[in-house]
Amino acid sequence: MTRSASASNGPGVVRSLTPFLDPLPIPPRRVIAEPTRLTVRLQTAMHQYHSGLPPSRVWTYDGHLPGPTIEVRRGVPVEVQWDNRLEGTLPVTVVRAPRFEVDGLPVQCAPGRSGGVPDADAAALPGFSVTHLHGGLTHATSDGWTENLALPGQSTLDTYPNDQRAAMLWYHDHVMGVTRFSVYAGLAGLWIVRDEREQELGLPEGPPYEVPLLLADRNFDVGSDGRLTGELLHKTDPEVMECFSPFTVVNGAIWPVVEVEPTTYRFRLRHGSNARTYRPVVPRDGEPDNQ
């Protein structure tokens, strides 16, 4: 494909989605005060990343993207039964596109396949799963080792002691060799551990003044009419395995907005992208404030 043939898939398509239009979603909370067993179901669902996009087929925890935020006090053990009810194959088109620029953008930062051919092996991936609590001090038997797979219709039971200092962790799928695809498909959520030392700081706890933010980037396929289809696209070039996608997603929404009051907020960020880096800033009078 020549550059001119692919120009319609460049910055103009990215700009077709209006930023700061949709409200910031807040994942549902599961607040745990005593030793508990939870059941979290892995499900295939439809999810709309932006009001200007058609819904996308995704993989989720409990039908939410991101999955429910689990909040627990330090030292309170939690058992989680991860119930795999995923249907169908991987809901992401995986391509490697020829190495060239699209209107000045690296090819993987432009929407659409850009001449890349879908990976047939990735397209056939079934919904195997194993969940890992990233950053958790967890026994090996519950750590979500990459080959301890549960097939659709099966479950795993893991124990999390939560005996560690306050932190915002995240849980995600961890299948050997394809973690990048299954997390891209939606299998991720937040896990908050609280302790007395954190409580002494007097920081906001819970909504609306504590705002968890799971950052990610996503790309989408483009139809013959030049419009985004909503189909998730994982595109790389032949020389770079890492994926850098053009749309920034926060809590499952592209470029969302949150209305705030003139008071203290606690914004908690978790980086959930494959490789992209971010430089979060707070604007003051229209300019970045790095103080």
Predicted regions and their residues:
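Histidine-centered copper-binding motifs that mark active-site loops
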Residues: 1-291
